[in-house]
Amino acid sequence: MTKPIITFNNVSKTFEDSGTQVLKNINFDLEEGKFYTLLGASGSGKSTILNIMAGLLDASSGDIYLDGERINDLPINKRDIHTVFQNYALFPHMTVFENVAFALKLKKVDKKEIAKRVKETLKMVQLEGYENRSIQKLSGGQRQRVAIARAIINQPRVVLLDEPLSALDLKLRTEMQYELRELQQRLGITFVFVTHDQEEALAMSDWIFVMNEGEIVQSGTPVDIYDEPINHFVANFIGESNIINGTMIEDYLVSFNGKEFESVDGGMRPNEPVEVVIRPEDLQITLPEEGKLQVKVDTQLFRGVHYEIIAYDELGNEWMIHSTRKAIEGEVIGLDFTPEDLHIMRLNETEEEFDARIEEYVEMDEPEDGLINAIEEERNEENL
């Protein structure tokens, strides 16, 4: 990892008036030029992290570093960090040009330089020619672009975005996801994005921090978070999941619904209680006798690209299936899946425990070079 641009070291926050602890020992390093997302439900602490980073709130304990320098006591205007707020915080009585140029005027930048940089920045956010427009006459998407232009015109080290897409309609929100991601990659500035929308996080991020009740419960790439959730909360919060109670018989063998199935997971105790995650899109509908499981279709909804089918097995477990095939309510169908489709979770395992287990398991599972060489020599002798 390169030298971090932002570091949180054991940062906690408690509001003194209520005594409520909203952050609990937050630790992370952010690299330069990446798109990070703080993802969590309302009240999870994600916006509090953003406000502490910006200098709008003080941490109760812990240290915050920017480029290796502690900034806990550094005023907002001295931090090379700019924020795009949920309501954009634009000046309604000013034009687009005046809003974007505001920070440069405070710094007493030359007028010609201001005009040049405003024009360049508006072009970046696809608002070229909007300089003299009134803020009040702009659409929601255009106002957001103005807010982003104002945040990046000084070329800050970090841009913070506090749920800036939440007020937009679905189509515009999707368009802005592409635009924000492309803009961040073009500028090479570190973006820290706050959202409760898991689809936004998965679509835009290099790295996601999943938050719950003031703690980071898992961090990783979008693929890691989706394919390898470490606990029930993450599996349930990120995408749709079928989560079934089971038993890890031994490495690569799990039992649930009274049957044993091959898996690709290991490193757990024999006969340890676990939870098994199967994503709805990984379940294939078959004839009942050909399926690994048999379920009875209860209801279904057409979601445009697939049918969302709800079915129940003989034990009463609910199953969600995504299929391009329409099912018949009341019919019994088979469900097929591969070992790779099963993700096994230990009960109440933390991210640190998960990482340590996987590292230890991989080391134990790797054959030594001496054994590999011996096997190869044996095969060569047999071929002679």
UniProtKB/Swiss-Prot annotation:
InterPro entries xref list: AAA+_ATPase, ABC_SmlMolc_Importer, ABC_transporter-like_ATP-bd, ABC_transporter-like_CS, Mo/tungstate-bd_C_term_dom, P-loop_NTPase, PotA-like, Transp-assoc_OB_typ2
**UniProt KW keywords:** ATP-binding, Cell membrane, Membrane, Nucleotide-binding, Translocase, Transport
Summarize where ATP binds, as residue positions. Answer: 40-47
Q: Where in the cell is it found?
A: Cell membrane
Q: Which PROSITE patterns does the record cross-reference, listed alphabetically? A: ABC_TRANSPORTER_1, ABC_TRANSPORTER_2, POTA
Q: Look up and give the membrane topology term.
A: Peripheral membrane protein
Annotated catalysed reactions:
ATP + H2O + polyamine-[polyamine-binding protein]Side 1 = ADP + phosphate + polyamineSide 2 + [polyamine-binding protein]Side 1
Q: What is its EC number?
A: 7.6.2.11
SUPFAM superfamilies registered for this protein in UniProt: MOP-like, P-loop containing nucleoside triphosphate hydrolases
The record ties this protein, via Pfam families, to: ABC_tran, TOBE_2
**Among its keywords, does the record have ATP-binding?**
yes
A single Gene Ontology CC term: ATP-binding cassette (ABC) transporter complex
Boundaries of every ABC transporter domain copy: 6-238
Among the GO molecular function terms of this UniProt record, one is: ABC-type polyamine transporter activity
**Can you state the subunit structure given in the record?**
The complex is composed of two ATP-binding proteins (PotA), two transmembrane proteins (PotB and PotC) and a solute-binding protein (PotD).
What family does the entry list?
Answer: Belongs to the ABC transporter superfamily. Spermidine/putrescine importer (TC 3.A.1.11.1) family.
As for what it does, the entry says: Part of the ABC transporter complex PotABCD involved in spermidine/putrescine import. Responsible for energy coupling to the transport system.
The name on file for this protein is Spermidine/putrescine import ATP-binding protein PotA
Organism, by scientific name, is Streptococcus pyogenes serotype M4 (strain MGAS10750)
Name the gene.
Answer: potA
